[in-house]
Design a protein with these regions (language model features):
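Conserved phosphate- and dinucleotide-binding cores of soluble alpha/beta proteins
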Residues: 61-161
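N-terminal active-site beta-alpha-beta segment that forms phosphate/nucleotide-binding
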Residues: 1-87
């Protein structure tokens, strides 16, 4: 998994849309998700404005991050920015964790709908990070599901729209 995450890191950081982005939303990886600490630190070192999700009850906001070592465990035991961290309203790009994806950009998350609610109406470019083994032929979708614009795996960078 770590080797695949490093390959994904390399592909993400070479994307033109990433190099041109000033504000980037990412996520704190847990479990078997694509690991993001290296990606976050790379963005911070490049001088980009980076924010991570913070979940409170049924709402998710993105809050600015300057140092991943200062995150604290949140509602789902996921490292998050502290409550007093400024909210980042708009993003050029958001990197999104995916349990499953299809090549059309349909995504399976954890089933709570936090990302779909947050991304509704967002002008950010949505990039789903996933391992190639998690790409399937089709994902069932509902009217509230938000598609990814790009998918990045250890093998491919796929533009879906």
């Amino acid at each position: 998994m770590e080797i695949h995450s490093k390959k994904i890191f390399s592909k993400v950081t070479k994307m033109k849309i990433i190099s041109e982005a000033e504000t980037i939303g990412c996520y704190s990886s847990i479990g078997s998700e694509v690991q993001t600490n290296d990606i976050i630190n790379y963005f911070l070192n490049e001088g980009k404005s980076v924010s991570l999700p913070k979940v409170s009850q049924d709402e998710m906001t993105f809050r600015k991050v300057e140092d991943v070592s200062k995150l604290e465990k949140g509602e789902f035991d996921i490292p998050e920015p502290k409550d007093n961290t400024p909210i980042q309203e708009n993003h050029d790009v958001i990197l999104i964790p995916c349990i499953g994806l299809d090549n059309q950009g349909n995504r399976i998350g954890y089933g709570f709908g936090f990302y779909d609610k947050y991304l509704e109406g967002s002008g950010a470019v949505k990039i789903g990070l996933s391992y190639s083994k998690q790409i399937v032929k089709t994902i069932p979708v509902s009217k509230n599901d938000i598609k990814m614009d790009w998918i990045v795996t250890e093998k491919d960078v796929i533009k879906t729209s």
